[in-house]
Amino acid sequence: MLQPRVEGNDSFNLSVTAYVDKQSRVTMLGSAQVLLEDHSPTALGNPVAMITEPYPHLYEQVSSFLQGVGWHGFANFDFKVDSRSGIPYCFEVNPRIGRNSYYNTSAGMNPMKFFVEDVIAGNSVTPQRLNKRVYYSILPKHLVLRYVDKEMGKKIKFLYRQKKNHDPLYYPAEWGLSLRGLKRLAYVLIARENHWRKYRRNYPVSKFKEGVTRSLDTAELTRL
């Protein structure tokens, strides 16, 4: 199979998470712009920094596809916007929830609620669409800022000031005054700092600057 290359850095990638219930209703749609992916060989392509936001037109396309094929359950779509044409392309759809699905919970929409209500409780819930912008990342802020442009950097800093930043590993309830709690805290802190070494080795800033360095402006995608 031959296909044209879709240009753009990590920020041109988008994630859409959906859930379709037994009545073929798309009860959940959430999405986020990927800012940076993991570049280590064993985890290549996994998003590690994202900003959640709604993409109404992509939601329409996703809903039409899922209902058209009679889907039931979770679906995770990977899109990439071509940096030259601005056209979003769907790369794949996975019949499962994504590894980074917690970005939906960070924005106030827990995917498990829709599954439990549909499959276990047998209830019909009101369809929801993600509409909050939050910053989700497992990396130190200043590391991510090295791989985005100034405008994207301003967005990240603004969300930090608004306390709309979330790290799925950062859960103080696990850090009680016990040996187990202290070990967990040490793991989280060491893991975060270890990313500096991983990116220097696998994706140095010099390599990032060899390609497209501007970050994707999603204004058109978020417009109703």
Where are the model-predicted features located?
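ATP-dependent carboxylate/phosphate-activation module, predominantly the ATP-grasp catalytic core
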Residues: 2-70, 94-119
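Short acidic alpha-helical/loop segments enriched in Asp/Glu that coordinate divalent cations
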Residues: 76-78, 103-104, 128
